[in-house]
């Protein structure tokens, strides 16, 4: 594997996505046999990436980390901290490379974050969510939208919805404090959680990514089909941090 776009983590991942253009469906597939035996990771190969693709890739990296981070599994302090380090490193270095595309150190940091976010070390011993990836796969099955751009739309909206679920607020507030350096409001942790979402949206906007489906040219006409594809005709729920039906 020769890495040219830090995002999917294919250099150490056991996962891939299979697309069926006739049914407009995308399905994730994973096996230990998928992991590369050898990968070449040279940050210089990413210097010429367009800013939009750089931003999309960075959002995908953050999404891989957050799919594992948002979990109700207890006593996962070490993997929490590693995931937070991945997220804060991407946040810092994305702004650097968008300003200076040939910054070797910043490109290298993002590249390594992409690897660690998807080799599943941060998912060790904990339940993982994956609602947002499942949703984005179905959206991009119908519409021409970059994966990272779709995740930039779905993740903040998903977080905002979960602010209304009491069992989810503690972790959302922890994310806001540890990743975005928000001040913890112990009297109103939901307010802290919403501050983290606000700061995530700020990064997405600064990076030039869409925040709404309409910005990305996605209408409402396929919503029912997307939901049907996600739930396999309503036969199962989606997500572990919060189960959608």
Q: What do these predicted ranges mean?
A:
Residues 176-245:
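C-terminal charged capping/lid subdomain of soluble metabolic enzymes
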